[in-house]
Every structure is written in C-alpha cells, then in structure tokens.
C-alpha cells in the first residue's frame, strides 16, 4: 500500500478544504506511507452566489463536478458535506464511508442578542435555508428573514457590517473553521431540527475500486452512518434535495434509532412533524415510515408548491 496514491476531489471553499484535509490526515494516520493529494475544483453552487439556493436548484448543486472528476479518473474519492449529497448516485459511483458526526445543530450568531428568543419583533435574520426559515417563522412570525449566501467568512462579515441582527449557520461549519467563539448560542434540535446528514462528512468513490474501499474502512463511523442512513431514506422518499424545507434527525438509543422528521411551509404557516423508533438495522425502513407519516399529513402539497416556485424538480 505504501506506493498507493489517493487523489481527493474537493470544492475550494474553506469548509470543503477543511473537510478534505481532515480526510487526508485520517487516511495518512491510518496508512503510513500513503500519498494523499487534493484536487480542488469549483462547483455550480459555488459560482451562483447571487440567488437563493432554492431558486437555482436542484439536487447535487455542490457535487456534480466532483462526481465528473471521479468518473473521468481525475480523482479517486470525493469528500462532501452529507447534507449536500443527493440521494442517488451516477452509475459506477457510491457512498462508501461516513465519518463521525460533528455537532449537528444550527447555530444562532449575533453581535447584539443572546438567543432567538431575545430578538425583538422586526429583527432581520439571515439564512439561505428554507428549512431554517420555515421553523424560524413558525416560532417567531414577527421576524424578517433575509437571503444570505456566501462562505462562512462572507456571512459573518455581512453580520458584522450590520446587514442583519442575527444569522443562522450550521454549528459544525463554524466549529471546524475555528469560529466556535462566534456561536452566540446553539439552537436545540427541538427548536430547529437539522437537515439530514448535517454535521457529517461523506466520502464518495468508484463502486468497483475495492482497494480504495479498504483504505477508507478505518474512517467509517457506524453509529453516524446508521443515523444518516435513516435521515437520507426519509429525504429520498420525499424526493427531497438539500434546498427544500425538509428536516430530519436521528439519534441512537442503545440499538434503537429514534428518527424525527419535519416538512414546513417556508412562510411558517404550517409545520408537519412525525417520528418513530426502530432497530438500527432497519434504518432505511424507518426513514420511509416517517416520510410516509409526513406524506399522510400533506407534505407533498407543501413540497410541490416549493418546487413550483423554484421552477425545477
């Protein structure tokens, strides 16, 4: 193995590069002598920063270019934020490793106010996520939600410039980039259910490349993988991409998985909730079960309306 090289396809954002460097360090620690190099590239989602993610659409906005690199043998693995990974993979590719999850919660960031509850009526809150928006406006319909895109540094700079009273970001990204001190308060999953896979890093590679699969095995975290499998099964059954108002979060209780799911109107008008428990071996079935519960409550109507507004499927 000492002469083997692994090329990692990654986006060029600071967070994506952190994740790729993390995987590189883990691989080098597990396999001394292994040569690991990064192949940075720009995704469509990185280029289109002037529109809400829900408008420019679709699934795989941040991964397609990386998958092309794998298919054309320009890279051996691709490192992704699991919340950005589509449910289906191109023929010949698959997800072969999920690393241990960082804090999956959303983070409240403000220079003035201590928490969501402390925000006065009419406060301006920045987020690009319909999932966060739906839950936030259900809880606080007196707030004004404004579009916020860009990398973590850009978003923090906009807050510091006074464009927003507060912004909502994934806690994991702030922690990984050394901005943990900017987290004013972590938002309980009871108040803002995370996106499926939030806080987890996944590794995609060619399905036939068994040598790479073996090298990745020490990085795989079974507890995280089972939780994320249930979350992704819910998302897939709802035909959800990463830019729709779907939230889902699974926790392990011994050998049982507890999965909570949510679909909400971006306006905060309606929020549907469902939950169930099952053995961890039945993670996919559990995801489908909770998704079916949401569909029986009318989730499909909410999601069709969102897709119609975005102009894509």
Swiss-Prot record:
One CC-aspect GO term: cytoplasm
* Entry EC no(s): 2.5.1.61
Q: Which cofactor does it need?
A: dipyrromethane
According to its UniProt record, this protein's enzyme class is transferase
What positions are modified (S-(dipyrrolylmethanemethyl)cysteine)? 242
Q: In which pathway does it act?
A: Porphyrin-containing compound metabolism; protoporphyrin-IX biosynthesis; coproporphyrinogen-III from 5-aminolevulinate: step 2/4
Q: How is the cofactor bound?
A: Binds 1 dipyrromethane group covalently.
Q: Which Gene3D superfamilies match?
A: Periplasmic binding protein-like II, Porphobilinogen deaminase, C-terminal domain
State its role.
Tetrapolymerization of the monopyrrole PBG into the hydroxymethylbilane pre-uroporphyrinogen in several discrete steps.
Mention any additional remark.
The porphobilinogen subunits are added to the dipyrromethane group.
**What is known about its subunit structure?**
Monomer.
HAMAP family annotated for this entry? Answer: Porphobil_deam
This chain belongs to the protein called: Porphobilinogen deaminase
Which species is the source of this protein?
Answer: Pseudomonas fluorescens (strain Pf0-1)
